[in-house]
From Swiss-Prot:
Name recorded for this polypeptide: Cyclin-dependent kinases regulatory subunit 2
SMART domains: CKS (SM01084)
Family recorded in the similarity comment: Belongs to the CKS family.
Key word Cell cycle present: yes
Annotated Gene3D superfamilies: Cyclin-dependent kinase, regulatory subunit
SUPFAM superfamilies, per the entry: Cell cycle regulatory proteins
InterPro entries assigned: Cyclin-dep_kinase_reg-sub, Cyclin-dep_kinase_reg-sub_sf
The keyword Transcription belongs to this UniProt entry's keyword annotation: no
UniProtKB keywords: Cell cycle, Cell division
GO molecular function, one term: histone binding
Source taxon at top rank: Eukaryota
Assembly notes: Forms a homohexamer that can probably bind six kinase subunits.
Length: 79
């Protein structure tokens, strides 16, 4: 299932992680579970496409259509 209206932010980092957020269209956001963080299988089923290693790490209650992802930086890039 592919959705053209999924928006992917630029990636940004801190000392330990690389981050990005993904904004879903309203009709797709209705399928986001409210009780738990999604597994990779769940967010891929929604049509989110990104490389391996990304983890859905936080639910932002006021804007549940925005998915927050992170993945560890390689050791040589950690500050």
């Amino acid at each position: 299932m592919s959705y053209k209206n999924i928006y992917y932010s630029d990636k940004y980092t801190d000392e330990h992680f690389e981050y990005r957020h993904v904004m879903l269209p309203k009709e797709l956001a209705k399928q986001v579970p409210k009780t738990h963080l999604m597994s990779e299988e769940e967010w891929r089923r929604l049509g989110v496409q990104q490389s391996l290693g990304w983890v859905h790490y936080m639910i932002h209650e006021p804007e549940p259509h925005i998915l927050l992802f992170r993945r560890p930086l390689p050791k040589d890039q950690q500050k």
